[in-house]
Amino acid sequence: MKALVKRLFAMAGLGVYRVGASQNNNSHTPVVTSPIHHNSKEGLEAFYSNREAVESYLDPAFYERIIDLGLTFGVGYDEKRIADIGCGTGGLLKALKNRFRPRSLTGFEYSEKAIDIARSQVPDVEFCYFDIYEGSVRQFDVIFCVEVLEHLLHPDTALRNVIGMLADSGTVLVTVPNGRIDTFDGHINFWSPESWNVFLKNVCADLSVKTGLMEDGQNNYAVITKSESLVTAN
């Protein structure tokens, strides 16, 4: 019945989404007075120093859905060089390690406190300090950039740098919150599904890009492949 209702609304050009809880409903969510400061180096270190806030933020089920999204689009993980840009405390890489046999797993993160936590929780994975605006010459077959771009003043530059780390025929899986229902004051960018597609077409004009909403409607996604000169939206 839910699927039928969603299809009927979609035919009318409308979407049905579950609205996420306000940040104020979670006692462990940090109070944000300035999104710029919240996303600064100082703000990130403060966040990752708050154990309760970090534990409240983590969602292992979400990591599994991200991994499954890649599988849906034919992305393989076994014997692949995999990177997670903005890896936080390493939860996504830990999930990949438990399910697959990648050639290598590398986490890139701007917060040194987050890296310390990640190294303690997933000791056999490589974690590196990383400034997304500087990029890297290292190459990977699969790159995740999950819930990162909404925190950045220059997401276009950041995404181009991430794509620049792809090996030939490599794939980037990106997610950002659905800006129509995102209520977190710590975010700088808010993309509706439509504006998300416009943003991607401007940044990825020469790449294959498949976009959509994740099943619960909470997040926009993009599966970007370094191969065809094609941009399609699902």
Residue positions per predicted region:
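Conserved N-terminal segment of class I S-adenosyl-L-methionine
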Residues: 1-138, 142, 146, 157-159, ...
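Residues lining the SAM
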Residues: 146-149, 175
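A short glycine-rich, Lys/Arg-flanked "PGG" loop and its adjoining helix->strand segment in the class I
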Residues: 157-168
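Structured helix-beta-strand junction loops
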Residues: 168-169, 203
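Conserved beta-strand signature within the Rossmann-like core of class I S-adenosyl-L-methionine
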Residues: 170-177
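A short acidic, helix-capping loop that chelates divalent metal ions and anchors anionic groups
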Residues: 180-186
